[in-house]
Amino acid sequence: MKRRSPIFRMMVLLLGIALLFGGCAPEFSQNTQGNSSTLEAMAPTVTPSASHFPVQSETPAEPVTVEGEITAVRRSSFTLLLEDGTQLTVIPSREHMEDDELLQGNRAQVIYCPQERQENQIKALQVTVTVPEAYAQVEKLLDTMTLEEKVGQLFFVRYPGKKAPEEEARYQFGGYILFGKDFQELTKGEVAAQVEACQKEAKIPMLMGVDEEGGTVVRVSLNPNLRETPFPSPRELFKQGGLTMVTETEAEKCQLLKELGINVNFAPVCDVSQKEDAFMYSRSLGQNAQVTGDFVRETVGVYREENVGCVLKHFPGYGENGDTHTGVVVDRRSYADFLEEDFLPFREGIRAGAGCVLVSHNVVTCVDDEKPASLSGEWHRVLREELGFTGCVITDDLVMGAIQDYCDASSAAVQAVLAGNDLLCCSDYSTQYPAVWEAVQKGEISEDRVEQSVRRVLRWKVALGLL
């Protein structure tokens, strides 16, 4: 075989380099204009070969522009939700990932090279982030609020019955959660009137929530005046008619809640449970992680279309564990188990644009073997960084047995804020509000920390059309 000369081999190498950079692979430069931050790409430079042979390269593909809503923001990428429901994973430059405006709900225009697209992952040539005007008003509203009002916004409390309007006028709570007895024997008009009475006392419109999962956990549809029969569980509906029947029922559920003035449902249950004797099985879809993830994604889509808030629960996932209502539950599964199974439905819900995630009281040892997840800063870091969630994080009820066995109610509320929760779900606000207020007054909880959470709460209210 004839041996090729070194000059010939060099020319082949140069030809390969020219072809490699003949597409639209960018270098990056930063450009900021007005309220939009822009990341621009410089055209690649290719030095012509000194060879006598002409260098041939493919004509670069025209860049493609897409626009959508930012949902999840991870360390080196973010999710862009397009109008048709497509979810794109966008990989921008390192500099742009540090942009403070890269938040759930903001808009982004992304320019990318179609040659470098891998399924639904794109490498950005340019990213322009825009803050919708409604979100821009949040900062102005924060400037007008007293510190007491800001602390009040952190509380999503148990509806206190007839004195609910009076208590809202006093504390300016972020929201009320209603239970079955709050709807007993009432008509739709009577429920709506009670809710409206509370909203009239609120300087900032309230989140009004219920647990209307379907099946064993229903608050509204237990009352035959509000629905002829209680909503079935998603697990039962899925067996009967797949995801189509599930989403149709969720849409009906949203319509009923809106008639009553309820704007948040503490659902869907994202826990993966397939053992019939497990505590969470009857409330879960009863399917594997992939199918549960599909259910969560589709359900979140329905709630967004209906403009009703939903809450992904119970992060990081119960699995087949016991009941935290009655005492401490310890989960000793590996972190790999959570990555491969439990995180998947939460990740799907976050990427689909869910505005809130509820954190359970399980002690999950692979990340923190001392504190319940709800009070663990480490677990909140995982939720923010690993799953990319920038929306509201809420505790499970702070009077549940798992918390009472760990610490007292007042301490739990303070620890919950310090851990990173934005909203405290509590039935004992007369104890927990003063504890948080005192911690703020003493500087144990900084005003900056309070504002960080209030900002997220207000942004969620904007997303729901309350502001």
Annotate each PLM feature.
Residues 86-94:
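A short macromolecule-binding patch
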